[in-house]
Amino acid sequence: MKLSLVYGWDCTPEAFWALYFDPEFAVRLHLECLGSTSAEVESQEGDLTTGLVRTLRYGQRPPMPGPVRKIFGEEVVTTEVSTYDPTSSTTTFTMTPGTMADKTHIEGAIALTRESGSTVETFSLDARVKIFGAGPIVERFIEHQAREMQGKSVLFMRGELEG
């Protein structure tokens, strides 16, 4: 499953990344906006001028279809590792669920560009699930969740950046 979403921003890439990688904001985003049951920045090394790596761990209880819930349980705890490259204004990430990690591969990127005086975000996600008989169902669920979470995240970030 591949997903690509594009958003326009009325801020500089520097302002976007400063908020995105603010550890306190990341936790608030998950707890106040995305409905996470827990959220913690486990580590963040480097900075926005030279590049950084952040490990974020969060738990969620999304409304899952029966077969997905049976595989992953009521709560999904995810570890997200993001690597930011300031020269390309891009962060790449991997998301590893606590359950079925060996059968689930999720990676993506957020890239920012400047176009006509505004910032354009391109969010991309690639999810591959190798669970016999359930892979496509889980991939569709991941796509649905990604779209919903991105929409909520954008609104929350806009409130902070543009509000």
Task: Name what the model sees in each region.
Residues M1, E74-V76, T104:
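Residue-level preference for beta-strand/loop junctions
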Residues M1-M64:
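Hydrophobic ligand-binding cavity/cleft-lining segments
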Residues K2, E40-S43, G98, H105-A109, ...:
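Soluble, non-transmembrane catalytic domains of enzymes that act on hydrophobic metabolites at membranes
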Residues W9-C11, P86-S88, R114-S116:
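A generic beta-sheet turn/junction motif
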Residues F16-Y20, F123, M157:
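Hydrophobic pocket/interface hotspot
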Residues E40-M95:
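Glycine-rich portal/gate segments that line the openings of hydrophobic small-molecule binding cavities
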Residues L52, T78, T83, T92-E143:
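Beta-strand/loop substructures that line and gate deep hydrophobic ligand-binding cavities in soluble
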Residues V81-P86, G135-G163:
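A conserved amphipathic terminal alpha-helix motif
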